[in-house]
Amino acid sequence: LKALAHDVQRNLLTPIDEIGLPVRVETRSGDTPPDRKKRQRTRPPHVLLTTPESLSLLLSYPDSFELFRGLKRIVIDEVHAFATGKRGDLLALALTRLQAIAPAMQRVALSATLANPEGFREWLAPWGEIDTVELVTGEAGAPAEVEILLPDAERVPWGGHAATWAIPQLYAQIRQNRTTLIFTNTRFLAEYIFQNLWDVNEDTLPIGVHHGSLSKEARRKVEGAMARGELRALVATASLDLGVDWGDIDLVLQMGAPKGSSRLLQRIGRANHRLDQPSRALLVPGNRFEFLEATAAKEAVDEGKRDGEEFRPGGLDVLAQHVMACACAAPFQEGELLAELRASLSYAWVDDAVWQRVLSFVETGGYALKAYDKFKRIVRDGEGVWRLSHPEQAQRHRMNAGIIIDSEMLDVRISAGRGRGGRSLGKVEERFAASLSPGDTFAFAGMSLEVVKLQDMEVLVKAAKASAMIPSYGGARLP
């Protein structure tokens, strides 16, 4: 979503600047500097591009009522990517709060790969009033051209997942096409495929790598190079799945199983942004089971079938976070807040008994933590109004809120000498960093690096001639 927000901002600013409109467009995410976030609350832009998590945090400030009082509309791009999960739950609750602050606010959702449009209409509608949501269907473009890449011997290996057998053929495709976007399912595989391609890059073609653990500067540099048409190939993860529009891409390669027809269509859609010409994609299975998955996905795309997760009741852990965010913004009456959140499809099912359980959990931390004062987050006064137990609870909430599970990460920085860290390259997980010692080498951010020192949650490195390891990362299980 960060890459999508940055790309939409760039695409909006170009016509705004050309026309000379006095319109400010800004992003707000984990990449946004604290000083800009603070300024946005006192001098908000005309258009704010953000994520569900950042919006929820923004609503936790007391000035959020004044900030959003004049909100005209909220546009949810690529709604299929998160509406059915916990990020969708968080956004659904934020929508109910925004609707309470700005009742005339209009809701708009966009997607090119919906399997169940009626379900999304109901999710978007306040109080489930589906008739208030108009479904607008765009013109269908040329059907995608999807093929499965096979070894020269026409036998896919029995085992393995990296598809290293295909590296010479991948490089040949890169040479034949103007710009190639290569998708992998993990950050480890993105670095691994990049290193293997670089080893056979006899023409020294400009090839980049992009994933969520790289530093903001590294990601923006690669995104800018792609937007300017300076790269011949880019190896990426789901960090570039959503709606990033680079017109020069004429081929998409999917390494490994595509994990569904909708996901595959989303990635194919990054190529050839013209309705009258098909997007081209090659699926590269790592083993024979992935070949079967790739075949099924190709047949589904050819037949115009979509898949995706079904809507389910909203998570109570997300609801507890929302209650805490509301308490940070202002004291609340439990009956009024319950009526507000029931306006969303995700939480229309919450009855009084469930609501009291959630409030009790936020109040005490639950039966396992109620003996500890720091988990007593909210209290109810004599008039039945809930408020923060202490002002410090607001800062604790904003520091720890979110529904994306993260592992402990260490910064990777170029050593500036004398034990000082210089430019940041990104982050690796603590468990990987714990396996490193000074002198060890590993591949990261498209470079071979040697460990100089580990200190203060940082891995100080310098350039190396060879690498032996690639960082691996924990994450959500693939479908």
Regions found by a protein language model. Give the residues of each.
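Conserved nucleotide-binding/hydrolysis modules and their immediate coupling elements
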Residues: 370-479
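Helicase motor core with emphasis on the C-terminal RecA-like subdomain
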Residues: 1-329, 334-383
